[in-house]
Amino acid sequence: MQQIMSCGVAVYPDFEIPGEMERTCAYLRSARALGYGEVFTSLHIPERDVSGVLGELAALGEFVHRCGMEFTLDASGNVMNGFLDDPEKFALLREIPMDWLRMDFGFDPESIRRMVGMLSLKGLMCNASMLSAEEVRELVRMTEAWDGLKLRAHHNFYPRPETGLSMEFLCAKSKPYLPYDIPVTACIPGFQNPRQPLFAGLPTVERHRRMCAGDAAAELKKTGLISSVLIGDPFAGEGELEEVAEVCLGKPVTLRVQTEAEISEQERKILFGGLHHTRPDCPETALRSQSSRGMAAIGTAILPRENGGRRRFDITIDNEKYCRYSGELQLLLQDLPADPRVNVAAHVLPEDWGKVCRILPGTDFRLTEES
């Protein structure tokens, strides 16, 4: 069974800008239509007075709920303690229909207890990038006392280039949550509208800063440690939204291919006759279609053809010389030598090579023919 991750988007609205509310709502509708389930925003807005944004966040949260999405607010302990000490401001904060409060830094157990008692929350998010394994255990013990309150972990994003985490560090910091079944979220950048003031993307992992959103999401999915992906930059492009949803929600990846001139009708049926489900135990050299041999079993024999060497991104089909493997389709991930038992049937178009890394073992892909 393939892993399914949830996905979310971030917005940092300034509704004093003409048309900002309409633009934000349109963006959230588009995200929801693609399967996104969470909206993230932050009180870390040094450019604006914090108290001035509370009414805007309340309006935003209400719209998020009307869309059927969850609303997450990110704040520091210093900011939240300021609200706790100011009844008037805290009353405004309570008007925000937030589901999750992400505790960034500066929180102490007493302030957490006070907030939980005064806010109607679905749960808390801890800072997955910062806590040690012992701190995770302490937090779990503390939150167990609050019946019904859920706990999630959410990694930082890093606006400044060269400050993001390595994949190894991300995995090390994510593993302590596994024994408690605590979901972990990581962030990826969006390139269409990188967030001010640095405009350098908002990834958790540094090498994702210049990686397209779908590829970054696929790399996080491969770890088996990340349960949710958040596009940290606001107003991601439609293509970015689609490719991240495709990866996270397990939607089939579509690859355009050009066929060899001499392929048989039976080979064509195997190529384009339906979805290809990859085996969960694929080798490093290729993605093996688990469903292709079933397609071949009901058709005519696949005769050998003359082939040169097999190249990365070729689509091959085993012929009758491979006996019971006849009909198996493979998408090559490495160059391989020619084999008289294997027909080269098609080639993935160069424009789609980047999408191949999003096809993980146990997931689906579809081939379409380009003339």
Q: Where are the regions a protein language model picked out?
A:
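Active-site mouth loops of central-metabolism enzymes
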Residues: Q3-T24, L73-L84, R102-D104, M130, ...
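Short, well-ordered coil/turn segments that N-cap beta-strands
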Residues: Q3-V9, G35-G37, H65-F71, I96-D99, ...
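Short, acidic/polar
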Residues: P18-A31, F83-L92, I112, V136-L139, ...
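Catalytic domains of carbohydrate-active enzymes, especially glycoside hydrolases
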Residues: E22-I45, E95-W100
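Glycine-rich, proline-tolerant flexible connector loops at the mouths of alpha/beta enzymes
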Residues: G37-L60
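Catalytic beta/alpha-barrel core
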Residues: F40-S42, T72-N78, M98-P109, G123-E134, ...
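Catalytic alpha/beta core domains of metabolic enzymes, predominantly
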Residues: N127-I263, I270
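C-terminal functional modules
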Residues: E260-S371
